[in-house]
Amino acid sequence: MNATTIALIPLLPLASFLLLGLFGKKTFAKSGGIIGTLSLTGSALLSLFTAYNYFFVTGKVDGVYQKIEVLKLQWLEFGPGVSIDIGLLLDPISVMMLVVVTFVSLMVHIYSLGYMKGEERFSIYYSFLSLFTFSMLGLVLSANIFQIYMFWELVGVSSFLLIGYYFNKPSAVAASKKAFIVTRFADLGFLIGILILSFHAETLDFGTLIQRLTDSSSPQLHSAITGGLFGISALTWGLLLVFMGGAGKSAMFPLHIWLPDAMEGPTPVSALIHAATMVVAGVYLVARLFPVFALSCPGALEVVMYVGALSALFAAVIACTQTDIKRVLAYSTMSQIGYMMFALGVSGYGGEHGLGFTASMFHLFTHAMFKALLFLGAGAVIHYVHSNEMGDMGGLRKHMPVTHLTFLIACLAIAGVPPLSGFFSKEEILTAAFHSNKLIYGIALFTSGLTAFYMFRLYFSIFWKKEFLNHKNDLNHIGHIEHKEAAVSPLSEGEGHGGEAPMTMKLPLMILGVMAIVAGFVPFGNFVSSNGEALHSEFHLSMAIAPVTFGLIGIAIALMMYKSESNLPARVSTALRGLYQGAYQKFYVDEVYVFITKKIIFNLIGRPSAWIDKNVVNGLVDAGGMFAQDSSDELSVWQSGKMQGYAIWFLVGVVALVVGFVFMM
């Protein structure tokens, strides 16, 4: 397999980033979008070629897909036998991720040509978008754990730049800082985790590390199991800390607080973050080290399972109460990522036991299609209505037929309605959960009903309910827009009111709509499994009945409550006031963090530290200065400035030296 071809996949977006970053403001001020889109087109085509070549030509040997390191270069050398390499690794999950990242990013690039048209920093936006894509592509191709950490951090920097793109909005600046800081804490855990694992495995290379930490006769595994703190092995600590990094990036509870605020960035950025880059990076990380989790440390994998299930349910409940269209989708992402995580948690290794692993990756693949479609559809609605609030919408199906149809397809897909893509991947996840842990299966089943409810609550509120034009022709009517993204983007200055979105925005919606339908028919188990062997999972009608039933019940309840004007939602929220208020306020997790930060860290740590710094550290420094000052004052009396005095002291010194010399003799 040609290393140059593989290397070009991330290098094309990197070239776009450098070109637009250095010369975009003046030279490519208007053509930056075309340059960025062409670079991603090249990367997407090369990714498809690579996927075909790997899956059907060179990747399988004796019925097993191999890990192929197509490029390996020595980067840093610290001494004989001690070095850090960089390389490009191809295996089923990295190749699958190449296709997902480049395809979704290409759709976002094309969509942004219309959505961001006229933006003052148009080329800079595409520069940041290219950097984001390069970072994620570098991450999924990384051949060793140190290399993945470098690109992991670069993904964080890219998200910081894009979330804070509207830097003149204080809320956007605050959101970008919040995302950066929260994920930094998680990334610290990730760094410590990879140091522990690489120290005991005595390597940074993924293949060697996994082999050594899963071989029962390996001295490295023995070292990792016997070492540790507080009765927990070093291997468990390492994997849990690595998962902490993944939980931060993937917005798992309780490290999810940055995700809703990240909606302050442009809507196409939200599509990329939620569908194909930042939030799926954590799932990819756990999948990359899955053999170690499953074979050597099932306790850590159980933590992944419970955190994923809790996050899925927690986010789904919150999404049922939110009124901002993008925040509903944000919590929807958190819930679906939770599905992927607990699917990994319930999975075994190899054969039918590895169904959860395949189902998780399958859901990552299908979710990328319909979640990108949902966010881009939301962007088209915001572009038309000039608001993020569901209360400012309604009846848009007549005015936005393409957006309406594609959004409906995406809602049906995420609700798990057959025969759309989400149905097949969710069915596999629920099957794996049913055979592994009945409690997790019950949580997943209930969450699937909530998912259908809140997505169709969103759908009916936007496209049905009251007529949009009856109450909303005047932009001055909008006095309570929370997000203000529409007010910042030039596209929101009336361009949308003439009709539906331009073709550059509709084309990605239509393509993603098709993918949301057909992606579920891919025989995913033939290509991606926990051990590289084909997994032929059979469809069981009995397993599909329950989730489909729960989904249809959720849709029916949303239909009764939100298809037309009704006081039923108000009555339900009043009857469930405590739960509703808790969910609407996101169960006060942000307030808990503020309390911990201000009351505990600031008062119990910050204030005492400040007192010690002021009175002890500065006191010692000031005391030293005062001693020097007093000493100089005392000694200054000897500095009379008279030559006679200096001559006398010189003579005294000479005599003292002579006397000392005589005594030494």
Give each language-model segment a name:
Residues M1-A7, L22-S127, A201-F230, R288-F290, ...:
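Transmembrane helix-loop-helix hairpins at membrane boundaries of multipass inner-membrane proteins
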Residues M1-L11, T27-I34, V82-V100, G138-F151, ...:
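Membrane-entry segments of alpha-helical transmembrane domains in multi-pass membrane proteins
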Residues A29-G42, K177-G189, K398-T406, E500-G513, ...:
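Alpha-helical transmembrane segments and their helix-start/interface "positive-inside/aromatic belt" motifs
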Residues G79-L89, G525-S542, M561-M665:
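Aromatic-capped, Gly/Pro-kinked transmembrane alpha-helices
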Residues M107-I148, V157-V488:
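Hydrophobic transmembrane alpha-helices and their helix-loop junctions in integral membrane proteins
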Residues A413-F424, E428, G513-N531, T597, ...:
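Alpha-helical transmembrane segments and their membrane-interface junctions
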Residues E493-G496:
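Glycine-biased, low-complexity coil/linker segments
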Residues P502-I555:
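Hard-cation-handling environments
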